[in-house]
Amino acid sequence: VYALVKETARRFSLGNIEVKATSNDLYLAEKYDFVEILGETAIYKNHWDVMGVPYSWNMVHYDEQLLGGILLHYGYATEMATGEGKTLVATLPVFLNALSHEGVHVITVNDYLSKRDFETTRPLYMFYGLSADCIEYYNRYDRRRKETYKSDIFFGMHSSFTFDYLYDHIAIKPEECVQQKHNYAIIDELD
């Protein structure tokens, strides 16, 4: 699976990826700027906006990053310095564990990083039909926040996940709960 993600990242770094359009591609093209439909072809662009700024994908996993992804998948803490590619490394175990459709929490220290990492990596996940969203776009009482938790992958900051968990445990009615699944989590800045 990691080789598949690495190859997709490599293809994105070289340019747009063209595939036969599926219903999922049509849906994504209506919602996001990184997919375009031309006839029966879906074009996944290697450039899109991240936090309102134009961004071009230019990252490919190094062997050391693949090893980091394996360690994270098996539950080990992995220390990486600034600039060593934590966001890229996290794509590997996130992708692998999202294949079960049981939910993957990507937990960051602030809403900026949650949104940035989501917007940077979502084409990589969505190219394979995985759903992804970020809870930081919606407040606790917005129905879209509950829908976000139904995604295969959801990004958010640690305090948001914590408070959603606590509120769910004091909810009077089941429909007031927003969290759905607790399967796998990646925590950025564990310290």
PLM regions: where:
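Conserved P-loop NTPase motor core
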Residues: 1-191
